Amino acid sequence: MTLKNVKPDLDAAFKALEVYAEAKQHILRESTEITNETKASIGASISASTASDKKRQELLRDAETHAEKAGKILVQLQKRLKEDYGKFWRQDLISSAIFAIPEQEIVEAFALLSVLKQTEFPSRIINFRTQDPGSYLKTKTTLKVSNGAYIFGLLDCVGELSRVIEKSLDQPEFAVQTFTTMQELFGELERFTEFPNRKDPKMEKDRKSAGETESHPKAFSNLKHRIDVCRNQVLKCRKLLGNHTKLS
């Protein structure tokens, strides 16, 4: 008996796992940059909702710039993974929370920005522009995200819209308009309660970090829970607006 059939396959398996580990480390590094840019974008969008006209436009430009930077990093990351890892990189890596989270955050940032700018929501194929190195020109770029990242990113956007509404109660017309969009978006997402066990990567990561506690039960991160949270946010905003406007 010899190991001639074992060694080649074990060598190949070791190499595959080595490449996988390197790819995950690269994703982790880039994900931090994406998170920083999306947080900056969302923060600017939220601030724009209560700013005067001139300041509002300035903040929306900042929000767009940060969202575009995040998108550019992810496009470059996807390209790098395809080149280094191979054509099955998405199949093997997309289930990893560390990859799903940056996609989700980018959807959230671009979706919120679209509401504030009163433009169409982004599709799963997000169109944006990237700054050309050493130039003032921008190039049209597209980014495709996974189904899960798209759904959870839009659910996150519902949550951000509730923040916008709470800060905009002294602008009743804008607040009601934003609520109408929020309600319509949630109406499209509510059907996904049919798939209750899909996990929100961001919430799952938080749950694992906190440990299995009463405040972070196992169901905390599933899709049904996220939809229930958004439903409560819609109802809360409806009540708030009912107290401040003629919304019925």
Annotate each predicted stretch with a short phrase:
Residues M1-Y85:
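Leu/Val/Ala/Ile-rich N-terminal alpha-helices, chiefly Sec-type signal peptides and the beginnings
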Residues N5-E22, G43-A44, G86-R90, I126-L143, ...:
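Short, charged/polar, low-complexity loop and linker segments
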Residues V19-E33, A51, K55-D62, I94-I101, ...:
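Non-transmembrane, amphipathic alpha-helical segments
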Residues S41-S52, L81-D84, I165-P172, L189, ...:
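Secondary-structure edge/capping motif, primarily at the C-terminal ends of alpha-helices
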Residues L59-K140:
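Long, charged all-alpha helical bundle/coiled-coil segments in cytosolic proteins
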Residues D170-S248:
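Long amphipathic all-alpha helical oligomerization modules
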